[in-house]
Amino acid sequence: MARGDLEQISIGVGSNVQDGAVLHGDPGQPVRIGADVTVGHRAVIHGATLEDGCLVGIGAIVLNGVTVGAGALVAAGSVVTKDVAPGTLVMGAPAVVKRKLPPEAIEEQRCHAQRYARLAASHAQINR
């Protein structure tokens, strides 16, 4: 659900927000999602910024004011309370950095988002 009643929500090209996810901002804290981002099932993005190519796992929560850097990976079920550096894996509650991601893993996250974009386009063609 994208609830834009208090603040703006923007979703970049090629990004996907999966079933049961919630996007919501507070005054002065919009939700900004870059290009080729995946927001997993039941994730909550609350007043946060997700930069290009990152992936937020199933059931993860990203809280107000946080920026998840480009190509970062937030593990399923994590609670993110602080900024995440680009290209890093974070996990836990609260989330902590576990390691730097190799370039291949970062590229795979973008490819994952692009596969969802192609799937959406194919469904749009079928339903015409």
At which residue positions do the language-model features occur?
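A short gly/proline-enriched turn/hairpin at secondary-structure junctions
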Residues: 4-5, 26
